[in-house]
Amino acid sequence: MMSSAVCRLAPSPTGAQHLGNARTFLIAYWSARAQNARLILRIEDIDSPRIKPWATEQAITDLRWLGMDWDGDPIVQTERSPLYDEARNQLMDADRVYPCSCTRRDIEAAASAPHESEASGWTPDAPVYPGTCASWKNGDPLPEDKPFCFRFRMQATPDRFFDRVHGEVACNPIQDIGDFPITRKAESAADCLAAYQLAVVVDDIDAGVTEVVRGDDLILSTFRQLQLYEALGHSPPSHAHVPLVTGTDGRRLAKRHGDTRLSHFREQGMPPETIVRWAAKSSGLCPDSDAALSERTLDQIHQQMIDRFDWVRIHRQPTVVDDFGSTTD
């Protein structure tokens, strides 16, 4: 019997899915099935300038190749603009957003260089906005002479949440993050299309998502989204930020680390069981000493991980990959 929990797989078709993506999706999948949750597939294609036309179909193929399934048809962000516009208007009425015509160069020139916050230990993931346009109030005229986006007003109250992998995490939202854009730039409000931060919150609210699983490079994004949930009048889901898969240089996987695309391994004839076994062991869900894992079928491996699933088993440290194809069983 399906529970009331709702989880999601949310690939972004900005390129090929790689080993790091696979492990995060597998952990999310095992957690969802362990809860008997409804699992949705959402295609996060809102960042249209970076979207690759072939990447959506390939991502779905990759997920199915690894033995994952989901409930219902895929949800596609680019088909949901009216929902995002409605949420933006709600935020405007509450004076939680304002138009901003600053360029990235303007922001970098006005803001101090990214630094480690003495208050919380975070290194900002983008230049902290200095508030140049923040004096705008709802009802003031919109900019007419240059493109603008809508920027969300962060509240100064210190933010914290419990992460299922890392425990309690906290930040100073003004010092570590600052006001952030919820739309892309355009010449008019009607043409300001939703950006990632707003879209994912609206989508999760609409689907009733109760658990979000993603890489721990997105923890600062979670602080942004927690304030969006509050401003839109909804309680947030629980969060689990899993460690990244990195190269030997400590940086997350990229082309410089060799070809770690799932499609590459599939084309080379690697069985999906190899990747799923690696994800099970490297995540901490399955001990390295479990030699019997190599004898199990794909469905059997999935069922074992679903039966064993517990967030306390998930490692907190990144997994380093070096020449994956030659080091796996």
From Swiss-Prot:
Motif stretch ('HIGH' region): 11-21
UniProt cofactor(s): Zn(2+)
EC number: 6.1.1.-
Binding site for ATP: K255
GO terms of biological process kind: glutamyl-tRNA aminoacylation; tRNA modification
Cellular component, GO annotation: cytosol
Family annotation (InterPro entries): Glu-Q_tRNA(Asp)_Synthase, Glu/Gln-tRNA-synth, Glu/Gln-tRNA-synth_Ib_cat-dom, GluQ/Sye, Rossmann-like_a/b/a_fold
Residues involved in Zn(2+) binding: C100, C102, Y129, C133
Record's cofactor remark: Binds 1 zinc ion per subunit.
Keywords carried by this UniProt record: Aminoacyl-tRNA synthetase, ATP-binding, Ligase, Metal-binding, Nucleotide-binding, Zinc
Binding site for L-glutamate: R8, L9, A10, P11, S12, E44, Y196, R214
Family: Belongs to the class-I aminoacyl-tRNA synthetase family. GluQ subfamily.
Function according to Swiss-Prot or TrEMBL: Catalyzes the tRNA-independent activation of glutamate in presence of ATP and the subsequent transfer of glutamate onto a tRNA(Asp). Glutamate is transferred on the 2-amino-5-(4,5-dihydroxy-2-cyclopenten-1-yl) moiety of the queuosine in the wobble position of the QUC anticodon.
The name this protein goes by in its record: Glutamyl-Q tRNA(Asp) synthetase
Gene that specifies this protein: gluQ
